[in-house]
């Protein structure tokens, strides 16, 4: 499960307004890869963008979780890259194809069970150059609101992942580039991009 437009600066750069409630969409489990794996650039995609995100890993079956009880259902946290073909996103009017290709959801490097989201820095570098730099406190909807909202729609299962939105600074990843996402306390997720297939 993914949350869109959850940082005001990113909503602005996409030409949108800050939403009144979380905007959610789904990425297939076949989009998931691990740290060090290669992001495959599909031939249909003119460009592919990076999006640094905090990921929540669910630890138990849950439905309609009250905000004050979300910690009871969280197994831990990790990092995510919500890889996106921006042209397909604009063309389709919804996000499934643009964000659903195989390898379009790198996760890792590990799951941290003692992490508490607060004001930690979230950043992304592309070939060593900083492209995104913000703090988790900049999220519009925080973890309790996200889990409460998502679980009001669907039953969540152990191992489900919720990625929580990206800050401003999104942009394309060139062929054979290296993208690295960091969140203080969660380590670094690094992946390479293939040549366009």
Regions found by a protein language model. Give the residues of each.
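Extended, compositionally biased flexible segments
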Residues: 1-45, 50
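Catalytic-pocket segment enriched in acidic/His residues
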Residues: 10, 16-18, 86-197
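Short helix/loop capping segments that flank catalytic or ligand/cofactor-binding pockets
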Residues: 11-12, 35, 65-67, 88
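Ligand-binding beta-strand-loop-alpha-helix segment within the catalytic cores
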Residues: 52-54
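A structural micro-motif recognizing beta-strand termini
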Residues: 59-61, 110-111
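Short helix-loop capping/hinge motifs at secondary-structure junctions, enriched
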Residues: 62-65, 115-117
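N-terminal accessory regions of nucleic-acid-interacting proteins
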Residues: 63-77
């Amino acid at each position: 499960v993914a949350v869109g437009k959850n940082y005001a600066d990113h909503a602005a750069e996409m030409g949108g307004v800050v939403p009144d409630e979380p905007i959610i969409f789904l990425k297939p489990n076949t989009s998931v890869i691990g740290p060090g794996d290669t992001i495959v650039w599909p031939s249909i995609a003119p460009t592919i963008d990076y999006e640094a995100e905090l990921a929540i890993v669910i630890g138990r079956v849950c439905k309609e979780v009250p905000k004050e009880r979300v910690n009871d259902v969280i197994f831990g946290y990790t990092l995510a890259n919500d890889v996106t073909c921006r042209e397909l996103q604009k063309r389709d009017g919804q996000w499934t194809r643009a964000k659903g290709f195989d390898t379009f959801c790198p996760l890792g490097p590990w799951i941290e069970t003692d992490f508490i989201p607060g004001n930690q820095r979230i950043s992304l570098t592309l070939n060593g150059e900083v492209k995104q730099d913000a703090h988790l406190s900049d999220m519009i909807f925080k973890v309790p609101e996200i889990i409460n909202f998502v679980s009001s729609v669907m039953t969540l299962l152990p191992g489900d992942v919720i990625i929580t939105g990206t800050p401003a600074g999104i942009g394309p990843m060139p062929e054979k580039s290296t993208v690295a996402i960091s969140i203080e306390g969660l380590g670094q997720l690094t992946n390479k991009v293939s040549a366009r297939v």
